[in-house]
């Protein structure tokens, strides 16, 4: 029997259970895009060692959209940060080198984080082995280790596509949604059926316009669009000549083809989210989150936690707020007491989830400080100007990233802005406070003023080792929209513009992160077979040994 699957705990458990029950020994696993050490150790462990043949089918970087390339290597986050397995980095480099074989060696590099440095070191070795020549086809790249900013994937989504991904799970630029979610009067037999929607810029022009907007702004835009087409429809009633009739028909056809269905879907989704967002529990949660992000400790937090645990509300949401407190305050106050209460009420099966989150460094007890000092996070917020209190959502041309994140600019997005402006050296003292090594060009003016005189697009790869969230993808798209032409004062002319393209080994969100942590293989069938083998070998004496 051949099983072709992703390296997923549940799939492997079911396959092992089936093979042991059916007593099948000719069992083949083909993992896409590759196996993990954890799975290999399990399948070759006690009782299972000779039952399975394991192989993998490698997948290279895949263009998800015109500005997004991903390996879609699910599980790489856990491998890198829980298992300390750098196989995903090695696979990522093997795929990335193929891009350089096509476009040439990338000269200018900004690197932040330990795993980002490992990626670039392995890439440099591959470049020497393959003798790739340096070109300016890809002008530069900014490489981040995911742990430079664990905070952003854990914060609430406010961009349209970020919300869409969190609710439905975008895969390969597409999404499947149950018919009953958007459509009224769906027949009973069709309620569980799903409709397919493509969200790429080519297949869904309307979605490509609204995806990096703040969700409140999407409502305004849809109303403007509706009014525009209503106005066209009214004018078409008085049309008399053939040319005007053709224009009216063309506009209506454009509306039916590109806008009618997406507008209806977006309107219903946004209205559902606004209703959900206005619930008292969600309001309180977001208030606490926003206070943490500003670097301040919220009032009555212990009471909020106690009530939340007592009422046995959503555990993932609670742990998410713990993580935000850990990353902004240096730890959770009374963490061990809260952890004990959670395990008592929610169940001790969650101890594995706590273990993994603690291993990564996302949960820990806050140290008791004798003297109150400004935390590293507070310094970062202040120096990088991450909080904006004067956001006006009625303005149509807001250029600061904090606009689409309810007043908070994610750390990584600010670092990207500084890189394309050639200002990492200016802010190096505060950048070094972030996890991992910082490496950037000695002469940053080459980034701001390319030597080429041609009017061209200067492409910069933004590389995420360990995954990127749609929360951040939409922020980078927002930066892309606001990047001005590169102007050289000495020559008094524009020398092109910068275009950012995102490259990663996995697209993730906070739900996916939690779903992949705290998972253990079901050892029951493995040990059952192990003891059966002992009994056969020793003529039934295995029971006494057991």
Please identify what each model-predicted range represents.
Residues 1-546:
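Extended, well-folded catalytic/binding cores that form a central cleft or groove in large enzyme
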């Amino acid at each position: 029997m051949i099983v072709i699957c992703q390296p997923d705990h549940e799939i492997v458990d079911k396959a092992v259970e089936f093979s042991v029950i059916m007593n099948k020994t000719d069992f083949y696993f083909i993992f896409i895009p590759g196996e993990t050490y954890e799975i290999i150790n399990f399948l070759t462990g006690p009782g299972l060692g000779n039952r399975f043949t394991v192989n993998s089918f490698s997948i290279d970087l895949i263009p998800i959209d015109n500005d997004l390339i991903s390996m879609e290597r699910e599980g790489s986050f856990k491998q890198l940060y829980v298992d300390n397995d750098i196989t995903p980095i090695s696979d990522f480099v093997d795929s990335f080198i193929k891009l350089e074989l096509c476009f040439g060696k990338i000269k200018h590099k900004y690197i932040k984080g330990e795993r980002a440095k490992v990626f670039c070191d392995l890439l440099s070795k591959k470049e020497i082995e393959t003798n790739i020549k340096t070109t300016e086809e890809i002008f530069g790249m900014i490489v981040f280790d995911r742990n430079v900013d664990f905070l952003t994937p854990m914060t609430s989504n406010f961009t349209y596509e970020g919300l869409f991904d969190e609710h439905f799970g975008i895969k390969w630029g597409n999404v499947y949604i149950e018919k009953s979610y958007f459509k009224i009067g769906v027949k009973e037999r069709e309620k569980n059926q799903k409709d397919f929607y493509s969200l790429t810029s080519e297949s869904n022009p309307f979605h490509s316009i609204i995806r990096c907007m703040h969700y409140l702004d999407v409502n305004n835009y849809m109303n403007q669009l509706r009014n525009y087409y209503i106005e066209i429809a009214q004018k078409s009633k008085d049309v008399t000549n053939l040319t005007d009739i053709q224009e009216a028909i063309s506009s209506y056809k454009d509306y039916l083809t590109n806008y009618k269905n997406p507008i209806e879907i977006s309107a219903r989704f946004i209205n559902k989210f606004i209703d959900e967002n206005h619930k008292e529990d969600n309001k309180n949660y977001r208030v606490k989150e926003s206070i943490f992000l500003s670097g301040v400790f919220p009032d009555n937090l212990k009471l909020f936690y106690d009530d939340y645990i007592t009422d046995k509300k959503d555990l993932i949401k609670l742990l998410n707020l713990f993580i935000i407190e850990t990353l902004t305050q240096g730890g959770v106050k009374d963490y061990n007491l809260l952890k004990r209460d959670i395990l008592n009420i929610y169940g001790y099966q969650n101890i594995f989830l706590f273990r993994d989150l603690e291993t990564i460094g996302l949960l820990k007890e806050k140290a008791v400080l004798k003297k109150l000092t400004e935390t590293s996070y507070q310094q970062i917020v202040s120096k990088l100007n991450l909080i904006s209190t004067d956001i006006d959502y009625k303005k149509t041309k807001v250029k600061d990233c904090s606009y689409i994140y309810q007043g908070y600019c994610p750390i990584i997005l600010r670092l990207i802005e500084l890189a394309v402006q050639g200002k990492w050296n200016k802010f190096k003292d505060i950048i070094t406070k972030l996890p991992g090594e910082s490496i950037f060009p000695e002469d940053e003016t080459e980034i701001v003023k390319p030597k080429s005189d041609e009017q061209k697009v200067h492409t910069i790869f933004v590389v995420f080792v360990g995954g990127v969230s749609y929360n951040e993808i939409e922020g980078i798209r927002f930066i892309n929209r606001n990047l001005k032409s590169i102007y050289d004062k000495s020559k008094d002319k524009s020398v092109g513009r910068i275009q950012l393209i995102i490259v990663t080994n996995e697209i993730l969100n906070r739900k996916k992160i939690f779903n992949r942590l705290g998972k253990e293989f079901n050892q029951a069938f493995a040990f059952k077979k192990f003891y059966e083998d002992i009994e056969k070998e020793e003529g039934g004496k295995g029971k006494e040994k057991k």
